[in-house]
């Protein structure tokens, strides 16, 4: 089977030849692996056989990016959302948030007027080169993007945003719908230009270690209409939807299923997202991607990661509906040798 066939099969809750494989190592992790033997001339996704190719566009207000300060350890930059962040030079951690452009409701309209669909939001040469290569290799090609709470953190401090979601949900809903509409129009434009996607991969972190960052009721007031609108568009174009949402998001899974979500990712283990429990509870109502603990990957005892993969694959792969991925992304404390072992085990226990 090709990757395209394999993933389509899994998302239909049918059993392919083996579990599809995809993952997300950090840039700092890849740099470490190159020092430990990953060939410089082979992209990591090619070396390990990742099966999903993402093609996106710029969904931001496109403010200029400026470097304000650079040291041997840190870099302070503005972003295309108008924010200012401080990062380690290797971008190996979540950035420190220094400033955000929206502090009050009056700050939103000047940003909103910049969020319009435009052909220049897509790097067409790169997009078509990526698309044609991926299509020739039989990959599963998705349109990527994201709107909602996670994206809005690029405009507002998290605490201010969370308070606004409760005190003025209609305003937050307007911000989310504005971004969702931009995504819909841009996908429409890309499809009309010849990018025939196999699916969609959207990002919106809504959880943390202990649960949702906001209540299911707040999700329904602020997010649900926008999510359903874009999901409906995707389904009309035969594009199953994978949603990346970190943390524990169990409480809104029924809402996500109701509006048409096909697959939930990444299933953070430390947040209580156990793929075995989720698979047993939702069966063929939802597919799952991820759930393999990166802490087990970094454990010096090789039996730990083997048991992690064996025990979870045993349940998750039955009847299809599962794609391998780490339970978030691969940090730099996982060695090249350890990760090669991970993929060996995925192939061993992922056979049908």
What are these regions (language model features)?
Residues 48-49, 64, 89, 129, ...:
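Compositionally biased, low-structure terminal segments
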Residues 32-66:
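Segments that shape or occlude catalytic/ligand-binding pockets
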Residues 34-42, 88, 92-93, 338:
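Surface-exposed flexible segments
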Residues 29-32, 62-65, 85-87, 151-152:
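Short active-site-adjacent helix-start/loop capping segments
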Residues 1-36, 76-78, 105, 109-352:
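Active-site loop segments of alpha/beta catalytic cores
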Residues 64-117, 137-138:
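A contiguous, low-structure linker/loop signature
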Residues 15, 46-53, 69-71, 137:
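Short, solvent-exposed loop/edge-beta patches enriched in aromatic
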């Amino acid at each position: 089977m090709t990757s395209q066939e394999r993933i389509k099969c899994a998302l239909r809750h049918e059993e392919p030849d083996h579990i599809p494989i995809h993952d997300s190592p950090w840039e700092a992790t890849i740099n470490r692996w190159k020092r430990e033997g990953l060939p410089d001339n082979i992209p990591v996704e090619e070396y390990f056989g990742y099966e999903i190719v993402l093609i996106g566009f710029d969904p931001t207000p496109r403010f200029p990016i400026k470097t304000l300060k650079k040291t041997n350890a840190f870099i302070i930059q503005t972003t295309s959302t108008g924010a200012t962040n401080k990062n380690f030079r290797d971008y190996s951690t979540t950035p420190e948030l220094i400033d955000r452009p929206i502090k009050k409701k009056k700050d939103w309209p000047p940003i909103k007027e910049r969020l319009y669909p435009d052909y220049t939001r897509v790097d067409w040469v790169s997009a078509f080169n990526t698309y044609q290569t991926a299509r020739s290799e039989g990959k599963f090609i998705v349109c990527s993007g994201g709107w909602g709470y996670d994206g809005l953190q690029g405009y507002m401090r998290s605490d201010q945003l969370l308070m606004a979601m409760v005190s003025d949900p209609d305003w937050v809903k307007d911000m989310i719908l504005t971004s969702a509409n931009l995504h819909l129009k841009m996908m429409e434009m890309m499809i009309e230009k010849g990018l025939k996607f196999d699916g969609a991969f959207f990002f919106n972190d809504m959880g943390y270690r202990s649960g949702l960052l906001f209540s299911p009721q707040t999700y329904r007031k602020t997010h649900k209409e926008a999510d359903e609108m874009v999901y409906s568009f995707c389904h009309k174009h035969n594009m199953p939807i994978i949603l990346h949402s970190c943390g524990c998001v169990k409480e809104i899974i029924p809402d996500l299923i109701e509006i048409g979500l096909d697959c939930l990712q990444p299933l953070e283990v430390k947040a209580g997202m156990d793929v075995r429990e989720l698979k047993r509870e939702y069966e063929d109502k939802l597919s799952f991607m991820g759930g393999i603990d990166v802490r087990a990957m970094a454990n010096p005892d090789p039996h730990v990661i083997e048991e992690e993969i064996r025990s979870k694959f045993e349940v998750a792969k039955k009847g299809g509906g599962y794609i391998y991925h780490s339970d978030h992304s691969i940090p730099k404390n996982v060695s090249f040798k350890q990760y090669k072992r991970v993929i060996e085990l995925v192939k061993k226990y992922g056979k049908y």
